[in-house]
Amino acid sequence: RRIPLTGKSGILTSLTILDSAVTSDAPRTARIVHSIDEIPAHVWNACANPGAPISDNPFLDHGFLLALEKSGSATARTGWQPQFLLLERDGALAGAMPLFVKSHSRGEYVFDWAWADAYARHGLAYYPKLLCAVPFTPVGGPRLLAADDAAREALAGAALAAAREFSSLHVLFAPQEEVALLESRGMLLRRSVQFHWRNAGYVDFDDFLGRLSHQRRKNIRQERRRVREAGVTLRVLEGAGIEHAHWEFFARCYRRTYAEHRSSPYLNLDFFLRLGRDLPQSMVLVLAEREGRPIACSLLVRDAKTVYGRYWGALEHVPLLHFECCYYQPIEYAILKKMKVFEGGAQGEHKIFRGLMPVETLSAHWLAHPRFARAIEQFLEREGAGIARYVDELRDHSPFKEQPQEK
């Protein structure tokens, strides 16, 4: 077993690991590449996204990750140095992990700023750290990209070996079975909360409303009516129907949202244009217009079963338009397309009153410093208990007359 080598920047330059404990018919070796562009798209997608014609998880698609790099959004310059971990057997790709060397904690949505501050107060360096995630994307999905348990075990071992050159390893928004595997390797479980809507076989939006309590049903109808009375009309554009001018308008709205919060946007027009060109089947744009002029829009990303609410912005303020573009239109779209889930993202208890229920999301964390690891383990136990109570309290405020069952 050869331990990973690093340069002065903390960037991995080579990695060769043979994990005999999980090797079956042939040896598996792991190596690092510093750009998704070093991996042919069909090779990566066969490993990460076997679904067709629409990816099982478009955020792991080669085209999505390449757009992040080529647009300059996720690069060493922005604090996201790509470190894709590849597991190979007989020269063929058997597994992969989207790893990044991070010099900050922005754009992650599992917040560890307090951990970094504690390290700094004790004269320790928290950065660079090693992160497994999709940049700027708090969406769940596989992180140990492999077809069998043995390969996933090998990936976990290789990632932890690589992490010994850094302060820590963080695997964000992973599925339960992967987190369980990582826990068995000594990583710490962390829980957080998002809000998802589930399709209970609704015929249309009115059918969905009929499952809500009278007050919630009344409130939603009033909110939608007020948007119509403001003279706003909505259009849903998909795929090739989203033209260059639409992307330009959306990017203006996206930048406006960040400007209103006095922050810099993570993404740019080039990124969105690349998505429209390379992943058109996964793109959905909700466009709000008044008197024939576009005034606001939201971007949704879809796969075969799920629609994901991603970004929103408006050039004119219309009360309640945010709810229409970001919740009601996506729910209508999901019902129309017979999709199972609409993921509305993190934060905002107001979502529960609009039919999005709390869902726990999971991440796994390993810290090299033993004393900090013990302290954070104790913190995560307390935090996890608090998250469980929070979810129970939210569910007590369910807007549904009866809890819907996904169909």
Describe each region flagged by the PLM.
Residues 1-4:
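Ser/Thr/Pro/Gly-rich low-complexity, intrinsically disordered segments
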